[in-house]
Design a protein with these regions (language model features):
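Hydrophobic, aromatic-rich cap/lid helix
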Residues: 2-3, 164-193
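Conserved HGGG/HGGXW glycine-rich cap/lid loop of the alpha/beta-hydrolase fold
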Residues: 13-63
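Short alpha-helix in the alpha/beta-hydrolase fold that links the catalytic acid
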Residues: 41, 200, 214-223
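Active-site loop/oxyanion-hole signature of alpha/beta-hydrolase fold enzymes
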Residues: 52-93, 250
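Flexible "cap/lid" loop of the alpha/beta hydrolase fold
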Residues: 100-107, 115-146
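Short beta-strand/loop motif that positions the catalytic acidic residue
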Residues: 198, 204-206
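Acidic catalytic loop of the alpha/beta-hydrolase fold
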Residues: 209-213
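Catalytic histidine-centered segment of alpha/beta-hydrolase-like enzymes
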Residues: 236-245, 249
Length: 264
């Protein structure tokens, strides 16, 4: 059974939350493209887990925060929501901007043991010397496809062919993303050094053809953790869960199985 409702987080933010499945909990966090970009992951995990998939405030036509919140506000709000519900050993998975939120949540979980596993998929959120994050806002439709996908011709979207309501959602999503992550651009200057304090093993999955944040960026991101594994997904770009879903889900399943054995 799938249920979607609006929840109010402890810091006053509201988010649309979809829940499905039963079992150990998992939180799946989308990036700038919205919840559709992680829908396949959520559906897969819901076969064996209780999966929570929020739509971040301001995405897909939902209300934007009135005041400043940023990624830190989302991370704090989601973590507190899990804690208030008594959820423990949560597998947290984040794609792109969602990976940044997930990483921020992990550094905040300093004793409650709420988070039991961490998977970052082509995440942003840190500054890596020599590996700048591509300015997504400066790209046209072709540029987005070329930087985001291994096979851009297959996935390029012509804005003229997008229905008006969906185009409005996309424009609103970009406005919200710019508001919460545009300055400093797509990173927290303090996050990289804090990752060494994360207490759970992390898996960082990266599309080999990602030109938004390159595999070299991802490898450096992984090295900042005390315990992390870095895996490259062949023939995929910034969204390997869309271009190579089978390989991406297999990597997540293998990581989760190791996590079960570790905690069992």
């Amino acid at each position: 059974m799938t249920e979607t409702r609006t929840v109010t987080l402890h810091n006053g933010l509201t988010a649309l939350l979809t829940e499905a499945g039963q079992g150990r909990p998992a939180l799946v966090l989308h990036g700038g493209g919205g919840p559709a970009t992680v829908a396949g992951i959520a559906e897969h995990l819901a076969r064996t887990r209780h999966v929570l998939t929020p739509t971040h405030p301001g995405w897909n036509g939902t209300p934007r925060p009135d005041g400043p919140s940023g990624v830190a506000g989302l991370a704090a709000g989601y973590l507190r929501h899990l804690q208030d519900r008594g959820l423990r050993d949560v597998l947290v998975i984040g794609s792109s901007l969602g990976g940044w939120i997930a990483a921020d949540m992990a550094v905040r979980d300093t004793g409650a043991d709420t988070i039991g596993g961490l998977v970052l998929i082509d995440a942003v959120g840190v500054r890596i010397e020599g590996e700048p994050i591509t300015d997504f806002f400066a790209l046209d439709a072709r540029g987005v496809a070329e930087h985001s996908y291994h096979d851009p011709d297959r996935f390029q979207v012509d804005p003229a062919l997008v229905p008006a309501d969906q185009l409005s959602f996309r424009q609103g999503n970009m406005t919200t993303m710019r508001a919460i992550a545009g300055d400093p651009y797509m990173h927290d200057p303090l996050l990289l050094d804090r990752l060494r304090d994360v207490r759970v093993p992390a898996l960082l999955l990266w599309g080999e053809s990602d030109r938004i944040v390159t595999p070299a960026y991802g490898a450096a991101y992984a090295r900042a953790f005390a315990d992390a594994r870095f895996e490259v997904v062949p023939r995929a770009g910034h969204l390997p869960q869309i271009e190579q879903p089978a390989a991406t889900l297999a990597a997540i399943d293998a990581y989760a199985a190791r996590d079960v054995r570790r905690s069992g």
